[in-house]
Amino acid sequence: MFLAQEIIRKKRDGHALSDEEIRFFINGIRDNTISEGQIAALAMTIFFHDMTMPERVSLTMAMRDSGSVLDWKSLNLNGPIVDKHSTGGVGDVTSLMLGPMVAACGGYVPMISGRGLGHTGGTLDKLEAIPGFDIFPDDNRFREIIQDVGVAIIGQTSSLAPADKRFYATRDITATVDSIPLITGSILAKKLAEGLDALVMDVKVGSGAFMPTYELSEALAEAIVGVANGAGVRTTALLTDMNQVLASSAGNAVEVREAVQFLTGEYRNPRLFDVTMALCVEMLISGQLAKDDAEARAKLQAVLDNGKAAEVFGRMVAAQKGPSDFVENYDKYLPTAMLSKAVYADTEGFISAMDTRALGMAVVSMGGGRRQASDTIDYSVGFTDMARLGDSIDGQRPLAVIHAKDETSWQEAAKAVKAAIILDDKAPASTPSVYRRITE
């Protein structure tokens, strides 16, 4: 029998906790036998003293095991269970293409996603722009969709990693969110509860990233790869660029539209293509669906070219109660804003920098995200035709097209866009879409 205060004292004094001590504490969080004050105290000691790799693995596994873990064995699937997690960004719509692309190549992708957080958009919010789309199918239906379609994107249910929910709520109000072992545990507890064979992590770097510096993004990626592999799931991570909006759009309906256009080949933003392909390649290799980069890319390009990936997306939408002809008639179903017009810069020049975070917050301010959980979202608002770093801007080339609910909202967004995009008299050096691949 352990005492919570003795576990806190041990960590406070700089000692490593045992697997049993960590499990006792995490189960107590779940069962409400550990108080909020005790959770806060342990979180703060971990914040200051860090955790060893074995402690990090134990913490993650204990949080995963605080709820149900999905088991796919009974379905006798003929491919690997694989997924991707992103630390979040602006215009990061990769999940909507990646899931169907990997499923079309023989993987099974049971993606449990989140809502928007701060300046970052949420995959669930984007999908809810599709009329009727059900993000909470029951467990049996979720399994059926994975078996039949190969991919489903759903919200986190209360049975998955319940200890994390309470732990995170306390961290949020005690300035202990930005601790790498705690972030790692929180992310992976939910992902590992999916019963995965392989995982790829997309860790963003830059002005729209969750972590404020390249070094911290790198440290988080290395921690996640180390812990997930320690927990028995083949995992790699990519450090990808978030110094500009990733897609050509930012919002909900506008990003869904771009995802469909990407899958059908109607329009593919080159940076979005680079990042999506790179993540899919990792999933195919880790899932043993391809032996190397070249084979993986060839398979992925084939399912884009022959329409199979778009077909899988359409089947997923229909299986999750959206329209059965969504891919063919997306504009008929997606909401459109009352006012859509371009915003131009006040001067001419090349785009040298972008405050991606501020652009994400501008979408939230227009009603495209939540400031608090109870807010309702206006799925129609956002930006399209986003200019990119290095673009030459003048009276002919707008910074973006703003989709707003009225003139006042448009004016506020236009002011935010102009303030967030910096022009210079010479073009900046180009930045890669993918900085680094981390395998251990």
Curated annotation (Swiss-Prot):
UniProt cross-references to InterPro entries, sorted A to Z: Glycosyl_Trfase_fam3, Glycosyl_Trfase_fam3_N_dom, Glycosyl_Trfase_fam3_N_dom_sf, Nuc_phospho_transferase, PYNP-like_C_sf, PYNP_C, Pyrmidine_PPas_bac/euk, Pyrmidine_PPase_CS
EC class: transferase
Gene Ontology CC terms: cytosol
Metabolic or biological pathway, per its Swiss-Prot or TrEMBL entry: Pyrimidine metabolism; dTMP biosynthesis via salvage pathway; dTMP from thymine: step 1/2
Protein family per UniProt: Belongs to the thymidine/pyrimidine-nucleoside phosphorylase family.
Gene3D superfamilies (alphabetical): Nucleoside phosphorylase/phosphoribosyltransferase catalytic domain, Pyrimidine nucleoside phosphorylase-like, C-terminal domain, Transferase, Pyrimidine Nucleoside Phosphorylase, Chain C
Catalytic reaction list: thymidine + phosphate = 2-deoxy-alpha-D-ribose 1-phosphate + thymine
Keyword Calcium tagged: no
UniProt function note: The enzymes which catalyze the reversible phosphorolysis of pyrimidine nucleosides are involved in the degradation of these compounds and in their utilization as carbon and energy sources, or in the rescue of pyrimidine bases for nucleotide synthesis.
SMART domains per the UniProt record, alphabetical: PYNP_C
Entry's Gene Ontology BP terms: pyrimidine nucleobase metabolic process; thymidine metabolic process
Any matching Pfam family: Glycos_trans_3N
Keywords from the named record: Glycosyltransferase, Transferase
HAMAP family: Thymid_phosp
Protein name in UniProt: Thymidine phosphorylase
